[in-house]
């Protein structure tokens, strides 16, 4: 309902969506009344660290930074599988980090918006993908990646508010 009201007032412009996810930690201990772990939470590895809990996947309007979709899954669900649920269908561009590589090629991917135009997926590369390039093209790639990252910063602000201001953890 809130998203509908914001759309009517023109606050959600639907020109582009930024997608990202964050891990919401849950206690992995069995030292509780039921003597059990949370059955819906799972573990995942991020870098070299294991985490137990959930993932909050969000879709944020590119222009305003307002959240229009939220999906919560167990932590072992890969980011790229949730992308269709985070899109409005009206966007022209989708931004995401390297965890979303191949989102446009997956089965069930939304490749055209409601007006029939192709949606452009602007996903950051992994750093290792530009190692085999020439120095000149590496500079161009670095510039393009920085542009994508500057747009994606809006979604990180949302996670900062959720985790720091609201102390969001289970």
Predicted region positions:
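Polybasic low-complexity intrinsically disordered regions
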Residues: 1-111, 117, 124
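Helix-centered, glycine/charged polyanion-binding patches within enzymatic domains
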Residues: 92-93, 98-170
């Amino acid at each position: 309902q809130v998203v509908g009201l914001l759309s009517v007032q023109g606050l959600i412009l639907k020109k582009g969506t930024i997608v990202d996810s964050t891990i919401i930690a849950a206690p992995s201990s069995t030292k509780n009344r039921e003597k059990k772990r949370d059955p819906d939470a799972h573990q995942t590895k991020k870098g070299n660290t294991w985490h137990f809990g959930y993932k909050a996947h969000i879709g944020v309007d590119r222009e305003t930074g307002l959240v229009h979709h939220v999906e919560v899954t167990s932590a072992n669900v890969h980011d790229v599988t949730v992308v269709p649920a985070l899109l409005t269908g009206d966007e022209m561009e989708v931004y995401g980090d390297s965890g979303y590589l191949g989102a446009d090629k997956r089965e069930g991917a939304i490749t055209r918006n409601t007006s029939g135009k192709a949606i452009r997926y602007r996903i950051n590369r992994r750093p290792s993908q530009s190692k085999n390039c020439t120095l000149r093209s590496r500079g161009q790639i670095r510039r393009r990646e920085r542009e994508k990252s500057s747009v994606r910063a809006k979604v990180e602000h949302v996670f900062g508010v959720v985790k720091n201001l609201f102390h969001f953890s289970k």
